[in-house]
Amino acid sequence: MNILSKIKIPEFCMSHWLLRIPLAIIFIQQGLMKIPVDIEEAASYGLSYLVWWFVAYGELLGGIGLVVGGLLNKPYLPILDRCYIPDIGDAITRFSGFTLGCIMTGVIWIGEPESLMDVILYDNLHVLLWVGALFFALRGNHAK
């Protein structure tokens, strides 16, 4: 018998917060930097005003949605037991992750990289944010 299989490792069921909080802070901060939405700033990136508006508010609300979706995972206050809907927090988390993943895909595309290796080697912050957003889009509140 394998000796490692006998060792019981405790499960830290709140570990998703170690990824959720920093990701939310980055996206909220980036969204707040773009507000008020300015047409000249949108034009400097070659985007229309409407797209820039969706990016700014998508980053802000997506970051807030990551936190709110995690908080709605379980009723933390006894008064919330009556109005608790188990899947609403998961849906908010998944939608926020999907929205942020779409925004990060656009950010990477706007950089017009020459190859996939350029993205992986030189645009690693955006790739990290993209992967974090996709993690919550795919796992939702079922992340451990």
Could you tell me what each predicted segment is?
Residues 1-36, 51-144:
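Extended, low-polarity transmembrane helix blocks
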Residues 35-49:
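Membrane-interface interhelical connector segments
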